[in-house]
């Protein structure tokens, strides 16, 4: 019997896939596998029996991948399982970055009951915002989420530029032919009215949005970050917001300093917070775990090569 330890709440739809050969719980010891979402494992004492860790999500920054590799522990993720959920929220943010919806909502709450309608008509002009139709959107990173965002933006009438020097063949096949292929990220910075980031957090991508890159962008650019907080230099983006260089910054990863900065919208990491996404991620993670433990097959591992039984 295999022991599978859950370190976060995992969707029941995924857990139901385990049969009687598996003992699953959050208080097990000497586990063969770990299912995790956001729990940090950098200080976790891995038992000798541990063979695999499956993250119900794409990013693995909460897992010490190098340590796992040294110990022969296979680390899985679930690329694409939450792509639609994140795409939908990015599209929502795209509209919110352009139209003055949130400031308008907050303003309406302050109006007196008497002559409410007249007050609305008199003051609504202060919340004018541009349409996204015909505007240029730059998508940095063309993985599952980036491709979905780019394709959806094309359908909304935007002129879309994509940049990803490491785009996979599978992603390239799915990308709309109407997406312009930016030769460099600098080209994208200079051309686009809106920029959305969809790359992993690595030493190379840390602070990729900084004073230097912001200076290349159009005045009044709108920036979306639904990938990782470390991609954007907080101090530099705040200065750009205060100067008007950046018209609006919307992020799924924030800080108190950002929350208190005008023209910033900070969400509480809601990108994958849909029941469908949680089900998809859990189902994929569980299937990867079972296939590895029972058959030795490796798919979607971030530290070991793909191995699939013919």
Question: Model-derived features: where do they sit?
Answer:
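Phosphate-binding beta-alpha-beta segment of Rossmann-like dinucleotide-binding domains, i.e.
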Residues: 79-136, 297-301
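NAD(P)-dependent dehydrogenase/reductase Rossmann-like domain
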Residues: 271-273, 277-310
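Hydrophobic/small residue at the entry helix of a nucleotide-binding pocket
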Residues: 145
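Conserved N-terminal Rossmann-fold NAD(P)-binding element of oxidoreductases
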Residues: 138-141
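Short FAD-binding loop at a beta-strand-to-alpha-helix junction that anchors the flavin cofactor
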Residues: 257-274
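Conserved beta-strand positions in the Rossmann-like core of class I SAM-dependent methyltransferases
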Residues: 5, 161, 230
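Rossmann-like adenosine-cofactor binding region
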Residues: 42-44, 165-257, 273
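An N-terminal-biased, well-structured beta-alpha scaffold segment characteristic
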Residues: 1-78, 190, 210-212, 216, ...
């Amino acid at each position: 019997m295999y022991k599978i330890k859950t370190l976060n709440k995992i969707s029941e739809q995924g857990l139901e896939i385990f049969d009687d050969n598996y003992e699953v719980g959050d208080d097990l010891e000497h586990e063969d596998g770990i299912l995790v979402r956001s729990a940090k494992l950098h200080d976790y004492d891995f038992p000798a029996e541990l063979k695999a860790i499956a993250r119900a999500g794409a990013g693995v920054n909460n897992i010490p991948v190098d340590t796992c590799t040294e110990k022969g522990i296979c680390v899985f993720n679930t690329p694409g399982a939450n792509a639609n959920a994140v795409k939908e929220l990015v599209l929502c943010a795209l509209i919110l970055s352009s139209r003055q919806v949130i400031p308008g909502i907050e303003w309406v709450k302050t109006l007196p009951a008497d002559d409410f309608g007249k007050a609305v008509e008199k003051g609504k002009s202060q919340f004018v915002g541009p349409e996204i139709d015909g505007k240029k959107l730059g998508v940095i990173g063309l993985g599952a989420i980036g491709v979905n965002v780019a394709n959806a933006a094309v359908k909304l009438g935007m002129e879309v530029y994509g940049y990803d020097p490491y785009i996979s063949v599978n992603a390239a096949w799915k990308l709309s032919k109407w997406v312009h292929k930016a030769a460099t990220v600098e080209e994208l910075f200079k051309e686009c009215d809106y920029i959305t980031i969809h790359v992993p957090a690595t030493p190379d991508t840390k602070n990729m949005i900084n004073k230097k890159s912001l200076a290349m962008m159009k005045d009044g650019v709108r920036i979306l970050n639904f990938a990782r907080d470390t991609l954007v230099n907080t101090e530099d983006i705040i200065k750009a917001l205060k100067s008007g260089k950046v018209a609006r910054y919307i992020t799924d990863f924030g800080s108190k300093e950002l929350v208190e900065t005008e023209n910033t919208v900070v969400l509480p990491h809601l990108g994958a917070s849909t029941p469908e996404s949680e089900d998809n991620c859990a189902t994929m993670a569980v299937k990867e775990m079972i296939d590895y433990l029972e058959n030795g097959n490796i798919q979607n591992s971030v530290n070991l090569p793909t191995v699939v039984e013919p």
